[in-house]
């Protein structure tokens, strides 16, 4: 059901195509995908995309991605069942928020135990505060009332964590510096935070300078091979740098098409 493999990703792509073409078939298909996504919501308010895992927080496989997709659907279909699913999804995800770390628990299993049980807090587009921040930025622009209040509160709680995670050992979009720093820039487009804007611009300049001096562009090889792909590899880094030159290019991490 998630953004990567399921209904949430389909909804965002289909509504994006509708906005580009005005072809109602895309919107009708998005509505059908949304009905299935709402029906699949678990009692805890999350979604179980993998039968071997519990409900997760986060953008790629967790509630942040599902709720963002439903908020995009709400733009075109003001249905109470969609609104209720969004509220429940936010409540579930925020039940995993830990104030001390200004981040959300990563409930995936690694070597037989949950990552969160060892106090490891992922900070990436895929899992953790950066992707959740991007989801909330989009939600506060699509929704109104109580949902916006929740989204803005989450944004304020997590922006510092996201910016502090922009100088790690990997530069990819999915779980690296270019992805996290680009999410901070999306925040700066919406919120008049001049201090964060200046810090973000400096971080991006430093990252691009380091990338230009590294033949691997800061990407660790997988099994001895260079990753050329978009989210995990060179293509995504190149696209993110292109967005510095052309501010009109869409944010692919939010599945924007324009």
What kind of feature is each model-predicted range?
Residues 1-84, 95:
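Solenoidal tandem-repeat scaffolds enriched in leucines and small polar residues
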Residues 11, 15-19, 67, 74, ...:
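Alpha-solenoid repeat junctions
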Residues 72, 76, 116, 138-146, ...:
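Terminal, non-catalytic domain-edge segments
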């Amino acid at each position: 059901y998630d953004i990567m493999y399921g209904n949430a990703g389909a909804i965002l792509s289909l509504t994006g195509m509708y906005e580009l073409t005005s072809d109602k078939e895309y919107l009708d298909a998005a509505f059908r995908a949304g009905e299935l996504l709402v029906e699949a919501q678990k009692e805890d308010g999350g979604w179980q995309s993998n039968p071997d895992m519990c409900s997760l927080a986060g953008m790629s496989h967790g509630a942040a991605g599902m709720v963002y997709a439903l908020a995009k659907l709400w733009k075109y279909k003001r249905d109470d069942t969609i609104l209720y699913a969004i509220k429940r999804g936010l409540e579930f995800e925020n039940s995993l928020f830990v104030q001390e770390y200004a981040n959300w628990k990563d409930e995936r299993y690694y070597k037989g135990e949950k990552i969160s049980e060892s106090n490891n807090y992922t900070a990436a587009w895929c899992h953790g505060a950066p992707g959740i921040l991007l989801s909330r930025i989009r939600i506060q622009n699509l929704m109104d009332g109580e949902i916006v209040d929740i989204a803005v509160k989450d944004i304020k709680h997590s922006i510092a964590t996201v910016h502090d995670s922009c100088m790690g050992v990997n530069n990819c979009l999915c779980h690296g510096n270019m992805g996290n720093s680009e999410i901070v820039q999306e925040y700066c487009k919406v919120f008049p935070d001049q201090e964060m804007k200046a810090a973000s611009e400096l971080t991006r300049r430093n990252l691009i300078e380091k990338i230009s001096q590294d033949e691997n562009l800061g990407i660790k090889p997988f099994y001895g091979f260079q990753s050329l792909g978009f989210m995990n590899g060179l293509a995504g880094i190149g696209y993110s740098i292109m967005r510095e030159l052309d501010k009109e290019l869409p944010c692919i991490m939010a599945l924007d098409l324009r």
